[in-house]
Amino acid sequence: DIGGGIKDDKGFKAVQIGGPSGGCLVESQLDSKMDFDSLSRIGAMIGSGGLVVMDEDTCMVEVARFFMNFTQRESCGKCVPCREGTKRMLEILERIVAGNGEMSDLDELEELADMIENTALCGLGKSAPKPVVSTIHAFRKEYEEHIVDKKCRAGVCSNLRVFKIDPEKCKGCSKCAKNCPVNAITGKIKSPFTIDHSKCIKCGSCIDNCPFGAVYTE
């Protein structure tokens, strides 16, 4: 009820608590007490006290990459575990969202996280892996889909999106083709158009310019 609920009545997915190095909590953890010990037990922390609520359209792998990118840039570089460990974790996450991940990456992420949490010199380093660890534990299936199926269920990771045109909805107006920067869309006026996936750069211009909602992603 706080803040009016989730926009457009979309489904709740997770809430990230404690700032950039805080953990992500799922629906079953929403009744957790907001105190240090209670949050520590479930892999989160009070931190800055900020809450980021995420709906069903959020990619949890990208969330982990986003926060790891932030903390990696904030690392002072004084200690090796934080400086190099967060860099390695970020590289792995970037591979996964790009569709180049391997199943062994998940074990490596957890091993790196454990090492950083136990050996980093300051609070930033010790808490930096929390967004990654918490999302792997709660949303491992999403990580596996990115790695094995090369699919982002939220449609957020552009490298994993496949753009298609629904022939039933397409009116053949050619707006998508005219606005495609790489000429990947062809067809005849008043007939369904098609997308050449070998040329498509997944910019999303076709979706933005289709007045009939005929372009979609998988």
Report residues per predicted region.
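Redox cofactor-anchoring modules in respiratory/redox and cofactor-processing assemblies
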Residues: 1-162
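Primarily a LysM-type cell-wall glycan-binding module
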Residues: 164, 171
